[in-house]
Amino acid sequence: MFLKAVVLTLSLVAITGARAEVSADQVATVVWDYFSQLSNNAKEAVEHLQQSELTQQLKSVTKGHISALRVIEKGRERNSWEHSRRVGPCEIMGRQVGIFGQPLRVATLPNCDLPVNSVPPNTHLSQAVGPYAEELRTQVNTHAEQLRNQLTSHAQRMQSALRQNVDDLHSSLTPFADELKAKIDQNVEELKGHLTPYTDELKVKIDQNVEELRRSLAPYAQDVQEKLNHQLEGLAFQMKKNAEELKAKISANAEELRQRLAPVAEDVRGKLKDNTAGLHKSLAELSSRLDQQVEEFRRNVGPYGETFNKALLQQVEELRQKLGPYAGDMEDHLSFLEKDLRDKVNSFFSTLQEKESQDTPVALPKQEQEQSAVPLES
């Protein structure tokens, strides 16, 4: 019934303001086709909104706290504006075009007022894994300092033995030199044993948080569940690959430290056959050489945690781009539809007004006007 009223109204406009060749059926067909197309665009906008929610879900992982605060603040401003005005984009559309916008407003209004809180809490994958990378730096510093203290303490014991056994340096200091080499091997192995478990814990944490991310995104990716699972599996594989590379780098640097410290112990052992002055000089330099090698190890391994975090953020951002092909949100799209609708309706009536100004309207007799008005009243 409503559509018949629209067609009848447009028919009257066409009869009274346009040329005879512009029929009411043609006008009704044009307007109805346009609203059908506009309704389809509105459905696409709703689908884009769902994709946008998925995009925002993943984007929050890569942008961190600052971006999260911006999104929250923007959402608050938008909600405040909407609640204060008590009007949404679809209602504006309906008011602009009067009765012509009513069917579209009824069809799309339920989807325009989707609550902001419908999106589940964000799963901050980087925040969950990040503490392990920071803990790695802390453990590197702690155990490197322990290694430094133990080797330095042993060097000091050798210096003390040198002062007490000037007459028989070779026999008194040889055990210390052998012990120094053994301590280097022992402490490097302990260092590896303390640091490498953190990479194994990282891999376990990765599996847990990727699964949590999968569950939280499932309601928003029902139509692309297979693609989502595939991409999340790829994300977990790349992250665990990064953890394995981190473990390999730690082991390689520990072995390199062992190789650099071994000549230091051999140098001291070789000086036992030299004079006392040369041995004193070698032992005096021993502590500083040990400190230098351990400090270089700490500087090399410490930043690996930050490198891991950066790789994690990059991989999550790549996942977000793969799963979020649609940009923009529902409100922006509906604003465009509103403007497009208003422009086309204005253009339509402007065309009628131009025709009216160019042609002299055909005056109907009063009796015919009264007769034509009777069906409207019934």
From Swiss-Prot:
Domain of life: Eukaryota
Organism: Canis lupus familiaris
Location, primary (coarse class): secreted
Annotated Gene Ontology cellular component terms: chylomicron; extracellular vesicle; high-density lipoprotein particle; low-density lipoprotein particle; very-low-density lipoprotein particle
Pfam families: Apolipoprotein
A GO MF term: phospholipid binding
Keywords assigned: Chylomicron, HDL, Lipid transport, Repeat, Secreted, Signal, Transport
General function of this protein: May have a role in chylomicrons and VLDL secretion and catabolism. Required for efficient activation of lipoprotein lipase by ApoC-II; potent activator of LCAT. Apoa-IV is a major component of HDL and chylomicrons.
Subunit record text: Homodimer.
GO biological process, one term: phospholipid efflux
Descriptive protein name: Apolipoprotein A-IV
Region (Disordered): 354-378
Locations listed in the record: Secreted
Record region (13 X 22 AA approximate tandem repeats): 33-324
InterPro entries: ApoA_E (IPR000074), Apolipoprotein_A1/A4/E (IPR050163)
